[in-house]
């Protein structure tokens, strides 16, 4: 049975993963780690580590992992380029899976949105994400991943075409503009819409998560799979084989 360490165990996702592991037949909890814990013990007792912490927590985890390489599943969002570079470097000596969303449905949404962006080149693209009032970052990491995918499908640099808000007399919408908008309220687990709009018709691709268990179960499946992989960076597409 695979021993999974939970890094960021006191957070919403950490608690959900702990709960889902109680009924998992292929894996069990090795240790619950949170800020101020013993990193050495976490690595010694775990076959795989799942990280849902904070950017600073992920940074600390990656630095320590170089001394005791273990497969890492990283789902922390809001990571900057420095941390992403550190992650890429660390993947030379251990398998690392990184995704802003562990839902298999979101992975398919991302795939379909990329294909639609390529096929519907004259359609305007707008992305809307909705989350609970407690979410700290905006736009969500998932929304940004979707935006990157649809921009790449059209050979566009997202940084040059992304819009995050509209107010006042701003003129007409530009052809390549990709809007990424955020709503916050209540206890919404997560909803993402990628819309393609043209005169006379529009297509909207939606994904709604109704429980954090969706993400937790996805992370556990990925952790079990990653434990058998060689050292390199992996994405949700590698896991799904698409």
UniProtKB/Swiss-Prot annotation:
Active site, renumbered: 131, 135
A molecular function GO annotation: oxidoreductase activity, acting on CH or CH2 groups, NAD or NADP as acceptor
InterPro entries hit by this protein: DapB_C (IPR022663), DapB_N (IPR000846), DapB_N_CS (IPR022664), DHDPR_bac (IPR023940), NAD(P)-bd_dom_sf (IPR036291)
GO cellular component: cytosol
Positions contributing to (S)-2,3,4,5-tetrahydrodipicolinate binding: 132, 141-142
Protein EC: 1.17.1.8
Binding-site residues, NAD(+): 8-13, 75-77, 99-102
GO biological process, one term: lysine biosynthetic process via diaminopimelate
Alphabetic keyword roster: Amino-acid biosynthesis, Cytoplasm, Diaminopimelate biosynthesis, Lysine biosynthesis, NAD, NADP, Oxidoreductase
Intracellular or extracellular location(s): Cytoplasm
Biological or metabolic pathway of the protein: Amino-acid biosynthesis; L-lysine biosynthesis via DAP pathway; (S)-tetrahydrodipicolinate from L-aspartate: step 4/4
Top-level taxon of origin: Bacteria
Major location category of this protein: cytoplasm
Catalytic activity: (S)-2,3,4,5-tetrahydrodipicolinate + NAD(+) + H2O = (2S,4S)-4-hydroxy-2,3,4,5-tetrahydrodipicolinate + NADH + H(+); (S)-2,3,4,5-tetrahydrodipicolinate + NADP(+) + H2O = (2S,4S)-4-hydroxy-2,3,4,5-tetrahydrodipicolinate + NADPH + H(+)
PANTHER family linked to this entry: 4-HYDROXY-TETRAHYDRODIPICOLINATE REDUCTASE 1, CHLOROPLASTIC-RELATED (PTHR20836:SF0), DIHYDRODIPICOLINATE REDUCTASE (PTHR20836)
Family designation: Belongs to the DapB family.
UniProt function note: Catalyzes the conversion of 4-hydroxy-tetrahydrodipicolinate (HTPA) to tetrahydrodipicolinate.
Name of the protein: 4-hydroxy-tetrahydrodipicolinate reductase
Lineage of the species this protein comes from: Bacteria, Pseudomonadati, Campylobacterota, Epsilonproteobacteria, Campylobacterales
